[in-house]
Amino acid sequence: MTSYRNFGIVGGGAWGTALAQLLAADGAPVRLWAREADVVAAINAEHRNPVFLPGAPLSSSLTATTDLAAMTDLDALLVVVPVPYLRAVLTELPPGDAPLVFCSKGMEAGSFAFPVDMARDLAPGRPHAVLSGPTFAHEVAAGLPTAITLAAADPALATELAQALARPHFRPYVSTDVIGAEIGGAVKNILAIACGIVEGAGLGLNARAALISRGFAEMTRFGLSRGAKAETLAGLAGLGDLVLTCTSANSRNFALGQGLGRGEAIETLMADRRTIAEGAFSAPVVAAAARADGVDMPITDTVARLVAGEMRVADAIQALLSRPLRPEGQ
């Protein structure tokens, strides 16, 4: 049985920093790579990340670097890089045999590749896994109770990684359904934007509940069409994450939707953010993949058109409400 003790984190955003703090809180050495020099300097000198995770004190055993070549001699790497930039980082990652645990959510434009698909191309032979579920970074960093899915095709790898990551307040549930975990994470971000639009436009809780329910039906159709298991989509990485991010402005995607619902321009909302609302990038990609697969995803398609500036919120609401009536199971 492999023992994973020495972890590295690739990505210094809020989620990467929170995972690093989770692992370093008991004094274990953790190495984090970030592209931003100011983030690295603050972590090393002040033990905090005021850019992406303000207010969270960090362990002195957490060290940071801007040198990706330094991410070697580690037992496992948690890769927490937004999907639009993931291929470039994987290309630069030094070779090795440490497992890659992908913690970002989304689908690559053009290739329709998920993070694990990119790893097969760019890091062949390296074991890989997915960590996904209902998590807000600031709560994990603060040690609040969290449950999450850890999926790997190799059940032994999933179990060993889960045991290494588990803490009294952080409970990974093991799965072998990698594609289900990836699809749940990608689609829920899109639906969180839709629910934020409902909130921002003042359309009420009934409308939000309907969007969550019908959005979950879209997630399930898309997931099953690509080989995901229904229980994964109904679990932490799917429905659990969907409920969390569709009901709180702490979600970047929900907050982006709120702005759209209030009538703010997508360009302004995106320009004001140093952090990434992953759903804005995932929406057009998942919508295109669904069309190619012949899967009906009207909410996803509508969000894709909204973030592309092709549709006004009022027209989007009318389009969804005027769709033909159908049985609920469809």
Swiss-Prot record:
Positions with a binding annotation for NADPH: 15, 35, 105, 137, 252, 276, 278
Pfam family, one: NAD_Gly3P_dh_N
Record family assignment: Belongs to the NAD-dependent glycerol-3-phosphate dehydrogenase family.
Any one of the GO BP annotations: glycerol-3-phosphate catabolic process
Pathway stated in the Swiss-Prot or TrEMBL entry: Membrane lipid metabolism; glycerophospholipid metabolism
Domain of life: Bacteria
Residues engaged in binding sn-glycerol 3-phosphate: 105, 133, 135, 188, 241, 251-253
Active site as annotated: 188
Protein name: Glycerol-3-phosphate dehydrogenase [NAD(P)+] 1
Keywords: Cytoplasm, Lipid biosynthesis, Lipid metabolism, NAD, NADP, Nucleotide-binding, Oxidoreductase, Phospholipid biosynthesis, Phospholipid metabolism
Organism the protein comes from: Sphingopyxis alaskensis (strain DSM 13593 / LMG 18877 / RB2256) (Sphingomonas alaskensis)
Classification via InterPro entries: 6-PGluconate_DH-like_C_sf, 6PGD_dom2, G3P_DH_NAD-dep, G3P_DH_NAD-dep_C, G3P_DH_NAD-dep_N, NAD(P)-bd_dom_sf
Keyword check for Transmembrane helix: no
Compartments reported by the entry: Cytoplasm
GO cellular component terms, semicolon-separated: cytosol
EC id: 1.1.1.94
GO molecular function: glycerol-3-phosphate dehydrogenase [NAD(P)+] activity; NAD binding
Function: Catalyzes the reduction of the glycolytic intermediate dihydroxyacetone phosphate (DHAP) to sn-glycerol 3-phosphate (G3P), the key precursor for phospholipid synthesis.
